[in-house]
């Protein structure tokens, strides 16, 4: 069976309220941690989300 090219990750909110987004990323082309600015419904504003492995 072939090895998966994409890895499932979670993007956790930097406001530390437990909200996260699930997404995938290519293991080969992007080895550094992903950070995105997205809307946090608990904080009701846009915050930075930081990558963490989905286990």
Curated annotation (Swiss-Prot):
Keywords: Ribonucleoprotein, Ribosomal protein. One of its GO terms (molecular function) is structural constituent of ribosome. Gene3D superfamilies: Ribosomal protein L33. GO terms for biological process: translation. GO terms for cellular component: cytosolic large ribosomal subunit. Belongs to the bacterial ribosomal protein bL33 family. This is Large ribosomal subunit protein bL33. It comes from Blochmanniella pennsylvanica (strain BPEN). The lineage of its organism: Bacteria, Pseudomonadati, Pseudomonadota, Gammaproteobacteria, Enterobacterales.
